[in-house]
Amino acid sequence: MNNDVFPNKFKAALAAKQVQIGCWSALSNPISTEVLGLAGFDWLVLDGEHAPNDISTFIPQLMALKGSASAPVVRVPTNEPVIIKRLLDIGFYNFLIPFVETKEEAEQAVASTRYPPEGIRGVSVSHRANMFGTVADYFAQSNKNITILVQIESQQGVDNVDAIAATEGVDGIFVGPSDLAAALGHLGNASHPDVQKAIQHIFNRASAHGKPSGILAPVEADARRYLEWGATFVAVGSDLGVFRSATQKLADTFKK
């Protein structure tokens, strides 16, 4: 068995409520992803929803993270079984599912990552995740080593947070602050009191069901507040944001 992913250390850390500090990867480049993997983050999101990623760009990034202590988490573009199956086959074990609004959608996400009879994942006997058929116990181990994080970012999701958090196979609840702010009528203002109240409510309800919660918080004060509120897995920045900020600061140092 591949000791890099079995057992899934990120999944185990979440179950133990160990704080996991992460970073968002949106540059879609194996070199920048490799640098992130050397930085010491507990987890990294490789974004397939808003970043220009696909199967052909994800594979070299996974290769770049081989041996890194940072757990790769893929945000899928949509909660669709075929897309999820292909990402499983290339070697992802940790999934962030966007825009989950109901228990049924959460159940579909879980089922998409499990082989029958627990789920509906299609079977290929030779792919990158099982080292092209050379991992003898892959099928026996796979189902219990998948992490499913579902993203709540709408009013309906907030309304159904208890049912979503109680879904078997869901390992954590992730808040999408920007979309949630837009859904609550505060586009571009995730700091609005209504949005902050909703975020804290989601954290509290996740905790009530024994599930860890997470969020993207590139502003340090926000990240520390969310950790104080009980968030377990927090992405504290992005490669794109760090790169833009650092290059702008460097230019300003000499141009202004």
From Swiss-Prot:
It catalyses: 5-dehydro-4-deoxy-D-glucarate = 2-hydroxy-3-oxopropanoate + pyruvate; 2-dehydro-3-deoxy-D-glucarate = 2-hydroxy-3-oxopropanoate + pyruvate; D-glyceraldehyde + 3-hydroxypyruvate = 2-dehydro-D-gluconate; D-glyceraldehyde + 3-hydroxypyruvate = 2-dehydro-D-galactonate. Binds 1 Mg(2+) ion per subunit. It comes from the Bacteria. Substrate binds at Q151, S178, D179. The record marks R75 as: Transition state stabilizer. Gene3D superfamilies: Phosphoenolpyruvate-binding domains. Coiled coil: none annotated. GO terms for molecular function: 2-dehydro-3-deoxy-D-gluconate aldolase activity; 2-dehydro-3-deoxyglucarate aldolase activity; magnesium ion binding. One of its GO terms (biological process) is D-glucarate catabolic process. Keywords: Lyase, Magnesium, Metal-binding. Transmembrane segments: none annotated. GO terms for cellular component: cytoplasm. Its cofactor is Mg(2+). The active site is at H50. InterPro entries: Aldolase/citrate-lyase_domain, GarL, HpcH-HpaI_aldolase, Pyrv/PenolPyrv_kinase-like_dom, Pyrv_kinase-like_dom_sf. Its EC number is 4.1.2.20. Belongs to the HpcH/HpaI aldolase family. KDGluc aldolase subfamily. Catalyzes the reversible retro-aldol cleavage of both 5-keto-4-deoxy-D-glucarate and 2-keto-3-deoxy-D-glucarate to pyruvate and tartronic semialdehyde. In vitro, can catalyze the aldolisation reaction between hydroxypyruvate (HPA) or pyruvate (PA) and D-glyceraldehyde (D-GA). The condensation of hydroxypyruvate and D-glyceraldehyde produces 2-dehydro-D-gluconate as the major product and 2-dehydro-D-galactonate. The condensation of pyruvate and D-glyceraldehyde produces 2-dehydro-3-deoxy-L-galactonate as the major product and 2-dehydro-3-deoxy-D-gluconate. HAMAP family: KDGluc_aldolase. Homohexamer; trimer of dimers. This is 5-keto-4-deoxy-D-glucarate aldolase. It comes from Escherichia coli O7:K1 (strain IAI39 / ExPEC). The gene is garL.
